[in-house]
Design a protein with these regions (language model features):
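Conserved interdomain hinge at the start of the Helicase C-terminal
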Residues: 281-294
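P-loop NTPase Walker
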Residues: 1-145
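Conserved active-site motif detector
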Residues: 468-577
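Conserved helicase/translocase P-loop NTPase motor core
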Residues: 51-67, 84, 129-174, 184-195, ...
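Core RecA-like ATPase module of SF1/SF2 helicases and allied nucleic-acid translocases
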Residues: 107, 247-250, 299-449, 454-462, ...
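Structural recognition of the conserved hydrophobic beta-strand(s) that form the central parallel beta-sheet
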Residues: 102, 130, 203-209, 462-463
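Conserved helicase motor core of SF1/SF2 NTP-dependent helicases
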Residues: 74-79, 84, 107, 175, ...
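Charge-dense polyanion-binding interfaces
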Residues: 155-163, 320-356, 536-574
Length: 577
């Protein structure tokens, strides 16, 4: 470009005197002009947009629409689009991090978005607010919540904004991003509307799949996502290329989803994998030869079915990873979590030093080395470390409060992942066995739940049409209602010596450790649950600790330790007289 001395002088003079756009047009070719306009290096630009589809790029390039609503089909890259849109807002549109807010419905989703954004834009991601509706609402209300308060905190936050009771700087936003928009309920949408009224120029980007709205039982309704589409200045995008599932699986899901009424999407999902795949029907799981080739999942409707399947797999010599129910307790009540917090000490300290953190982590891993919950603790601590530059106690408390055990249970190719359909939402597997009869159409929630199950599969889908086949053995998980809680008041030390996965013995309604000391007793509910099986000819053949927990009675300030367990039962053969 600069071939001689005079040209160099002219270039410098024009740089300082000429209109910037005219200067760029005169001295740079079209491709280079586009790169200069990007305000980032070509390598960074390629990382952001190089592997995105045309539709995904179209959504990210949309800088004009005040309301962007994306109806994203399964496997269409919803998470990728949202993360790259966040990166684009920060790097290409110069949206300041304090002006950007992303709301999700789970701590696991918030963590995943934060991790991916860190990978894309580096440390700048730490300053972006990616929060659940509940945690953001607690921030506005001005206190950390309890379980009871969490039920109404979103409504309360919306009311406070409407009444002008929230400091303006806390709610001054130029962009609001909503994940899983189909899951919004009345209070959630009221909060969104309050923010929209407070920030008249605020852009809203909402992504979701109305076909996967499976939380109607708690008030979610995709009509609120539809309401955003009807706003002036709204643009609806459909993402219908499925990069997850093979053609046979997508075709099967498409035929089924047509039965669901009131759908937002008008375009059928298309497989973009280039693979045929396979869909097969099985009468019973007992008929299946389950091979762990790639990631494999067995999805059920209930937690009880999950435990029965897991035990059946163990009897076949297959390892099962179970997304088990929390059984009526909070993640923060786990003995492993309580031990870690105790090792951190200094409850009044605002921050936790890295040295203290690492010491507490090491002691916890050593003390609970034999616990089957060790992997859960490792994932929990690792995720917090990745998403937090500094360790603030308030952040840790919030993180624990919003977390669930299943958030930290990872599927791998060495075991079969066993879960309810609800807990498998957002996951994907090479092979899926769907343990559910096809819904009869009377419940739209059931129909959508079945659709979620269908669309978890990547290569092979097995539809088990008669999942209620009687098994020779079953697993009976005990929850907080199934154990006699007052029994634990005098045996705290014995319970704290237990580890998840330890073997126990069952005798006359009591669970005993290796020293024949009673460490748990069944409640009336637990005895009734067990009797329902023993009346069918089943007997308890083994017992394994599932969790040890902290429990505080309503009439006491003292915490006690509770043991929950899985009872394994086998059908006894009738002897001929």
């Amino acid at each position: 470009m600069v071939r001689d001395y005079n040209a160099a002088l002219r270039f410098v003079n024009d740089y300082f005197t000429m209109d910037f756009r005219k200067f760029i047009n005169q001295y740079f070719r079209e491709e280079r002009r586009a790169q200069i306009d990007q305000n980032i290096t070509p390598a960074k630009y390629n990382k952001l947009f190089g592997e995105l589809s045309n539709r995904q790029c179209e959504i990210i390039d949309d800088k004009e629409s005040k309301y962007i609503v994306v109806a994203a089909g399964p496997g269409s890259g919803k998470t990728r689009v949202l993360v790259h849109k966040l990166a684009s807002l920060l790097l290409l549109e110069d949206v300041k991090h304090e002006q950007l807010l992303m709301l999700t419905f789970s701590r696991a989703a918030a963590t995943e978005f934060k991790k991916r954004l860190i990978d894309l834009v580096g440390n700048a991601a730490h300053y972006v607010d990616i929060k659940t509706f509940h945690s953001y609402s607690f921030d506005l209300v001005g206190k950390q919540g309890s379980l009871d308060e969490a039920k109404d905190v979103v409504r309360l936050a919306a009311e406070m904004i409407e009444n002008g009771e929230v400091e303006a700087s806390k709610i001054a936003k130029s962009v609001l991003v909503i994940d899983e928009a189909q899951d919004m309920g009345e209070d959630d949408f009221r909060l969104v509307q309050a923010l929209m009224r407070q920030n008249e120029e605020m852009r809203v980007i909402a992504v979701g799949d109305d076909d996967q709205n499976i939380y109607g039982f708690r008030g979610s309704n995709s009509k609120y996502m539809q309401s955003l589409v009807e706003q002036d200045g709204a643009k609806l995008y459909e993402m219908t290329d499925n990069y997850r599932s093979a053609k046979a699986i997508v075709d099967c899901a498409n035929r089924y989803v047509q039965r669901i009424p009131g759908r937002l999407k008008h375009t059928s999902i298309q497989s973009a994998t280039g693979k045929d795949g396979k869909v097969m029907t099985l009468k019973s799981l007992l008929d299946a030869e389950i091979k762990v080739e790639g990631s494999t999942a067995i999805l059920t409707r209930t937690n009880e079915e999950t435990m029965q399947v897991a035990y059946e797999l163990e009897q076949r010599g297959l390892h099962a990873t179970v997304a088990q129910s929390m059984g009526g307790f909070r993640f923060g009540n786990l003995a492993e979590v309580r031990y870690f917090l105790k090792q951190l000490g200094g409850k009044d300290d605002v921050t936790i030093t890295k040295e203290k953190w690492n010491e507490a982590k090491q002691r916890t891993f050593e003390t609970y080395a034999s616990s089957t919950c060790l992997n859960i603790m490792q994932h929990f601590i690792s995720d917090f470390e990745i998403t937090h530059q500094s360790y603030y106690r308030s952040d840790l408390r919030e993180y624990i409060f919003e977390s669930k055990i299943e958030d930290f249970i990872a599927a791998d190719e060495r075991s079969v992942f066993v879960s309810t359909i609800h807990k498998a939402k957002g996951r994907e597997f090479d092979n899926v066995y769907l343990m559910s009869a096809i819904p009869d159409g009377r419940s739209v929630d059931d129909m959508r739940s079945y659709y979620v199950g269908l669309t978890r599969a990547k290569r092979n889908l097995y539809l088990v049409t008669n999942p209620q086949t009687e098994c020779s053995s079953v697993s009976l998980p005990l929850n907080m209602k199934d154990v006699w809680l007052d029994f634990f008041r005098g045996i705290k030390e014995h319970v704290l010596h237990l580890r998840s996965g330890d073997n126990l013995q069952y005798k006359d309604g009591y669970l005993m450790n290796e020293q024949d000391i009673n460490v748990a007793a069944l409640s009336a509910s637990g005895k009734d649950k067990l009797k329902a099986w023993t009346d069918k000819g089943y007997e308890v053949v083994s017992v394994r600790v599932s969790y040890t927990l902290a429990w505080k009675p309503q009439d006491s300030n003292i915490e006690y330790a509770v043991c929950l367990a899985n009872l394994h039962l086998a059908k006894q053969e009738k002897t001929s007289e």
